[in-house]
Amino acid sequence: MYADAVTTVGAALRVISAAHTPLQLDFTSYRSPFALTTPEEISRDAEPGRDPFDGYLTRTLVPRLRRSGVDAIGLSICFPGQMVPAYSFALKLKRAFPEAHLVAGGPAITQVLLRLHGPALRQALGAFDSAVVFEGEHTLLSLCRALDEGHTSARELACIPNLVLPDSSSGAGYLPGPPAVDLRGLPAPDFDGLPLDRYWSPQLLLPYDPTRGCYWGRCAFCHYGLTATGTARYRERAVETVVEHLGALSVRHGTRYFYLSQDSVAPKTLGRLADALAESGLDLRWGTDLRPEAQLGPELCARLRRGGAVACSLGVESASPRVLRLIDKGVTPAIVGKAVRNLAQAGIAAEIMCFTDFPTETFDEAMATLRFLEEQAPHIAAFIVGQFELTHGSRVAREPSHFGLRESWIVRGDALGTALFFAERRSSKRARERVRLEQALDRLASGWLLRSYPWAGSLSTAHTIFYYDRFGSGVFRDLSGQAHGQLLGTTPAKQTSRLDLAKLALAEENEAKIWHEITHVRRQISRQTYDRLAAQLPRMRYLRRA
């Protein structure tokens, strides 16, 4: 039944996307071809026929907010895939509540706004009255207190650190303040008011951050979280505070499941936390993300398991020694392999996160990563192999020549500059090698039942942790080869397609060529450019003749 539910929800999302074409919607992304490139495109994507959330917002959310007498509304934009709907929500909320103060915050909007200045920064605010950059607990509290006292103008609010506001002379700006807060002074997260009983989950799993930032902080590809470059400064809560918070949240919300949702946590600290949890008698179950350190020996892994650890996702990145050195990962494949085996032998699901195509990575080096995964397969609970993407605040973007890049660029016409493109000095892989790599990855993945987020079989997710806790850390290897689910309420049937699939495949290939021309050759994006390039292609009849 679970597989059937996954298939049915996936089909529903595809239907929603088709009804709002050219939108592509899933649980991690919300994409339309020209999204966020100009204020006009932002407004276009907010139109009712293009926004699947329009009915909910106008018929449910706005009346609910109106009944509450709201005078301040905040939108947290954590992930890039949330940017488009956030701007759409902002336009409609401002239209419905012109007197309310509308504020944005979160990692995704922070990393956009920090790169912009003056008029460009003002344009990026869109319909928002303000935006919080960096970690926002103190800034948001100061804003709410100021609004409560009747201070509503940008001039009156300009004294609040890290609050981006319109400015009549410069366009927009903010008073710089400390980017990171004192984690030890913060209370436990507050989930009151959220409809936790309506989440698609058989049980409740809550996120909790025992630390913030990264204690290593040197990986060249990384620009993550609420920071201008790299990663934020590492901070920890006291172990006794973490245990107290987790215990209180467990009782209040009736759950024993948590995800320790920090960027990284020092192994020594995690060991002390596991010991304290074991001694507390709380009997919690948790997962987290870790660096694959040499300290993850058999004794520490056994302590983690006794303290309730169910799964640990390891940021492995690559199994090529040269690529790891270039990244400045600080570990070797041998260290990673031992950490994986020690976790697995302790009964903890060891999940592996890798990626290919780091600048200058060769085909042989990418294949070394896949061979490593194959060798460690008996100990790996699940894995993902992504593809490198260049991010603005990473060391690769700041020092491109050191990493073999000829150049990097933002295409003209992209007002927010959300996409960063690059070219290597020398192409590291041929086209046919990329095909071979994808084929090898498909063969490797067939040894597990792997799914996309947020389903069981994806990494660092609630459903996956529940599966590990119930069926053991090898459950997704055991389920490999399981048939795909069926649409609920339907009968399987075969039908001849009305569409010419060969022509559809050719159309997809042509679409990719158009976007390569736009992003890598002309380096300018607009509907006019797209239309001119599309007009140069021969027209095709996609419906089969009767």
Predicted regions: what is each one?
Residues 1-70, 88, 95-98, 114, ...:
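Conserved Radical SAM active-site core
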Residues 75, 104, 133, 224, ...:
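Conserved beta-strand positions
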Residues 75-79, 260-263, 290, 356:
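Short glycine-centered, acidic/aromatic-flanked micro-motifs in structured strand/loop junctions
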Residues 152-158, 172-175, 234, 256-258, ...:
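Acidic/polar loop patches that form or flank catalytic/metal-binding clefts of enzymes
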Residues 184-349, 371:
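Radical SAM [4Fe-4S] cluster-binding motif and immediate context
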